[in-house]
Amino acid sequence: MSAMIEKVLIANRGEIALRILRACRELGIKTVAVHSEADRDLKHVLLADESVCIGPAPAMQSYLNVPAIISAAEVTDTVAIHPGYGFLSENADFAERVEKSGFIFIGPRPETIRLMGDKVSAIAAMKAAGVPCVPGSDGPIDDNKKRTLELAREIGYPIMIKSSGGGGGRGMRVVHSEATLLNAIALTRAEAAAAFNNDMVYMEKYLENPRHIEFQVLADQMGNAIHLGERDCSMQRRHQKVVEEAPAPGITEEQRREIGERCAAACRSIGYRGAGTFEFLYENGQFYFIEMNTRVQVEHPVTEMVTGVDIVKEQILIAAGEPLRYRQSDIQMRGHAIECRINAEHPETFMPSPGKITDFHAPGGPGVRIETHIYSGYTVPCHYDSMIGKLITHGEDRESAVARMCNALRETVIEGIHSNIKLQRSIMRDGAFLAGGANIHYLEKMLGL
């Protein structure tokens, strides 16, 4: 299959590291697991062909420690490095170091990561490629106050001030009237300079009640690009996704084709390679591009379930220089899939709940998939993200996917630590969720936050 990649180093941990290991195994590729001192007992570390400890528990000293990861790749004769999601996956400097050190980076080119990582240049690139964007300042705001106020009137209030280097809900501020605009810009600038070392800010229309809908794309190194349809990730708490599904309720075949084609065309125009996701806000029938994730996403399984495409395997094959194995006409959405993220956290306070899992039982049955690295006796460390797994169900339609999810959540047993399974069960029974098409603020309202 991929003649040139004999060995992959997995620069990540937890469920995604295990997911990557399984894809490598299927392709007959040897694996190297790098891990922190706290992660010696991770499932993929125990399963990998080789493992290398790269540092102490804190991520800064291990999973974000570039020299340690590169030297682990060197001592194991690794051919390619898969960054997973989070950690170094969208770090252009890391991708560059990987390639300069003679390894294949399983992801886009460093310059593409850089282009899409800067919100201002990303939006400019997407506009040029014909992807619909949120009306805004078309670049950073300058010091001309009169022009800034005029522009804000044109866009229309409410307006969001965003810092160019921010993300994940940080470095942004909503302004409802002209009176507070200039002050808000100054505050956001100061915060951005302190947090991201970059005081560039821009403004865009603030959509009051949008849904979060994203499109999955795949592009090879020969300039071919396709989209795999959309996912709805509107069930969020504090900008963190909780439930994701594919396809998005109420999106028409025309909309899917139009926006999906534009995303694929944008990939071709920026020379994208690998798997990627275009995130949109969707309100009143309109899509507005917000950002592109240049990596595999947590919620990729829902797209895999409805399209039958193994996204992680495709990432590896693309990195090996293989052409895409699918044409756009091969991609059909079949049925409906839902994913619930399972977190080790207190159901009421949402505080992380690390500790030893004394008992774990995974659900089963038709159309049920679980992606998790936990097992009975495994200790969830306190140093990393609280997500310990993902439960995915697939059914012939949304109703049957939900019914299967309800069963799967009921069957899942995780003892010894707290989890958000109770929350997920209540979402699956919630009227607005069952109706489909809830907006991104709905879950916080439902929880009374």
From Swiss-Prot:
Mg(2+) 1 binds at residues 279, 291. GO terms for molecular function: acetyl-CoA carboxylase activity; ATP binding; biotin carboxylase activity; metal ion binding. It catalyses: N(6)-biotinyl-L-lysyl-[protein] + hydrogencarbonate + ATP = N(6)-carboxybiotinyl-L-lysyl-[protein] + ADP + phosphate + H(+). It comes from the Bacteria. PROSITE patterns: ATP_GRASP, BC, CPSASE_1, CPSASE_2. Biotin binds at residue 341. Its EC number is 6.3.4.14. It is an enzyme of class 6 (ligase). Mg(2+) 2 binds at residues 291, 293. SMART domains: Biotin_carb_C (SM00878). Hydrogencarbonate binds at residues 241, 295, 298, 341. Residues 123-320 form the ATP-grasp domain. ATP binds at residues 119, 162, 168-169, 204-207, 212, 239, 279, 291. Its cofactor is Mg(2+); Mn(2+). Pathway: Lipid metabolism; malonyl-CoA biosynthesis; malonyl-CoA from acetyl-CoA: step 1/1. The keyword Metal-binding applies. InterPro entries: ACC_Biotin_Carboxylase (IPR051602), Acetyl_CoA_COase_biotin_COase (IPR004549), ATP-grasp (IPR011761), ATP_grasp_subdomain_1 (IPR013815), BC-like_N (IPR005481), Biotin_carboxylation_dom (IPR011764), Biotin_COase_C (IPR005482), CbamoylP_synth_lsu-like_ATP-bd (IPR005479). Residues 4-448 form the Biotin carboxylation domain. GO terms for biological process: fatty acid biosynthetic process; malonyl-CoA biosynthetic process. The active site is at 295. Mn(2+) 2 binds at residues 291, 293. The keyword tRNA processing does not apply. Keywords: ATP-binding, Biotin, Fatty acid biosynthesis, Fatty acid metabolism, Ligase, Lipid biosynthesis, Lipid metabolism, Magnesium, Manganese, Metal-binding, Nucleotide-binding. Binds 2 magnesium or manganese ions per subunit. Acetyl-CoA carboxylase is a heterohexamer of biotin carboxyl carrier protein, biotin carboxylase and the two subunits of carboxyl transferase in a 2:2 complex. This is Biotin carboxylase. It comes from Allochromatium vinosum (strain ATCC 17899 / DSM 180 / NBRC 103801 / NCIMB 10441 / D) (Chromatium vinosum).
